[in-house]
């Protein structure tokens, strides 16, 4: 997917949010504005996409604005709706389907991958998925490398993109000592939580 936020149609985002808010029985207990008022504010935020660059004003004409906190919420609502529609209408549901923002991993039979990919892309004219197939060393998802063992179990390892610099906070830098210790603890925690025991 090129950029998730700029691919989300504002009208679709507002439509999905409207249905969710109008069907939310406890909205009045959590906030004083009505569903209609929240939708009006949402529409105002999503359509206020003007910005100044080198002395000229521009307006984004499609999609939600990158960097806007409401764009993250709307992108997740739209993607959830799209995924629910796609999985409920596809003949063979994926055995595994996980998404974090715009990074998705799915497990299907190899023969079903092109069909499911097309089915996902048919859900919306603007939101398009790309496919990365399992390579001999596995497939990456977020910061994990996932491999299928001969017995069908999944083995996970820590994954770093080829652009990863391997640069961390230098111990002899003038940073607080607790920050330096947290770098080591975070790396250790990541390894123990992500990696499948050998």
Per-range role (PLM):
Residues 1-198:
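Charged structural interfaces that engage phosphate-rich ligands
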């Amino acid at each position: 997917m090129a950029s998730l936020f700029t691919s989300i149609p504002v009208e679709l985002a507002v439509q999905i949010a409207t249905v969710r808010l109008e069907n939310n029985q406890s909205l009045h207990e959590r906030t004083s504005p009505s569903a209609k008022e929240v939708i009006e504010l949402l529409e105002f935020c999503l359509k206020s996409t003007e910005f100044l660059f080198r002395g000229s004003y521009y307006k984004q004409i499609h999609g939600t604005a990158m960097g806007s906190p409401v764009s993250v919420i709307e992108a997740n609502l739209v993607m959830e709706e799209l995924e629910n529609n796609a999985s409920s209408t596809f003949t063979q549901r994926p055995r595994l389907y996980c998404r974090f923002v715009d990074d998705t991993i799915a497990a299907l039979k190899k023969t079903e991958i092109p069909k499911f990919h097309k089915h996902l892309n048919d859900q919306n004219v603007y939101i398009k998925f790309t496919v990365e197939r399992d390579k001999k060393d596995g497939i990456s998802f977020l910061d994990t490398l996932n491999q299928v063992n001969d017995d069908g179990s999944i083995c996970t390892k820590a994954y770093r993109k080829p652009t990863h610099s391997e640069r961390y906070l230098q111990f002899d830098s003038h940073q607080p000592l607790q920050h330096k210790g947290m770098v080591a603890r975070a790396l250790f925690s990541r390894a123990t939580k992500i990696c499948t025991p050998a």
